[in-house]
Amino acid sequence: MIHSTAKIHPSSIIEEGAKIGENVVIGPFCIVGSDVQIGKGTTLHSHVVVKGVTTIGEDNQIFQFASIGEVNQDLKYQGEPTKTIIGHRNRIRESVTIHRGTVQGGGVTRIGDDNLLMINAHIAHDCQIGNRCILANNATLAGHVELGDFVIVGGMSAIHQFVIVGAHVMLGGGSMVSQDVPPYVMAQGNHARPFGVNIEGLKRRGFDKPTLHAIRNVYKLIYRSGKTLEEVIPEIENYAQTESAVSFFLDFFTRSTRGIIR
């Protein structure tokens, strides 16, 4: 079904069954598969391919040669009808690739709202991306990676399968990340190592001084106290009683399976 207000270039191929919403613009030489839904106000600029069971929300901007919902690169994949779900107001720049999920990984590759995926970024099967994240040019996520909200991944960085990156993390360019990264941390290198709290980013997002102070203290407990995580968690719980932002650390540690960067 194609909404009457949608504008579709005659060179594009829209397969029967695709659902194209109100005021959608599809530029030249795009291909949209039969199981694709595109929400109100989204633009496919040109040469965009959207396949598989893919849902794209409202007011997204998708630039030329992006590939969304294509067959993933997991050797176990046998053509199951897994999904790709993209939220609202994302900017997906040139040559970005986003692959559909796998049955073993939950069946969905999911991207939230208000993200910027720069040129040549790759999001593999079953990745879960939060809101307001930035992936700079050539940043690559392997399968099953999770990014919290407000994560910045520097250019030419690579994140290993199953890694969890906490909210408000900033990863410097060229980083190779093979272990989980706690919330609020800045990290860089091959392999990535922590080098402080993302203070400037937190200030821009309205974190007040008492909250920043608590986050810094938790960072010091984790990385400078010489104690194990098991030893510092009760102290983190004490901070969380008065500063709700600290609870992100506790939630993160309950889900972390790969160990944290050191």
From Swiss-Prot:
A Gene Ontology term for the protein's cellular component: cytoplasm
Domain of life of the native organism: Bacteria
Family annotation (InterPro entries): Acetyltransf_C, Acetyltransf_C_sf, Hexapep, Hexapep_transf_CS, Lipid_A_LpxA, Trimer_LpxA-like_sf
One Gene Ontology molecular-function label: acyl-[acyl-carrier-protein]-UDP-N-acetylglucosamine O-acyltransferase activity
Keywords noted in UniProt: Acyltransferase, Cytoplasm, Lipid A biosynthesis, Lipid biosynthesis, Lipid metabolism, Repeat, Transferase
Biochemical pathway: Glycolipid biosynthesis; lipid IV(A) biosynthesis; lipid IV(A) from (3R)-3-hydroxytetradecanoyl-[acyl-carrier-protein] and UDP-N-acetyl-alpha-D-glucosamine: step 1/6
Entry EC number(s): 2.3.1.129
Primary location class: cytoplasm
CDD domains recorded: LbH_UDP-GlcNAc_AT
Localisation per UniProt entry: Cytoplasm
Alphabetical GO biological process terms: lipid A biosynthetic process
Signal peptide per UniProt: none
Catalyzed reactions: a (3R)-hydroxyacyl-[ACP] + UDP-N-acetyl-alpha-D-glucosamine = a UDP-3-O-[(3R)-3-hydroxyacyl]-N-acetyl-alpha-D-glucosamine + holo-[ACP]
Record PANTHER family: ACYL-[ACYL-CARRIER-PROTEIN]--UDP-N-ACETYLGLUCOSAMINE O-ACYLTRANSFERASE, ACYL-[ACYL-CARRIER-PROTEIN]--UDP-N-ACETYLGLUCOSAMINE O-ACYLTRANSFERASE, MITOCHONDRIAL-RELATED
Similarity field: Belongs to the transferase hexapeptide repeat family. LpxA subfamily.
Role noted for this protein: Involved in the biosynthesis of lipid A, a phosphorylated glycolipid that anchors the lipopolysaccharide to the outer membrane of the cell.
Quaternary structure, from the entry: Homotrimer.
Protein name (record): Acyl-[acyl-carrier-protein]--UDP-N-acetylglucosamine O-acyltransferase
Gene name per UniProt: lpxA
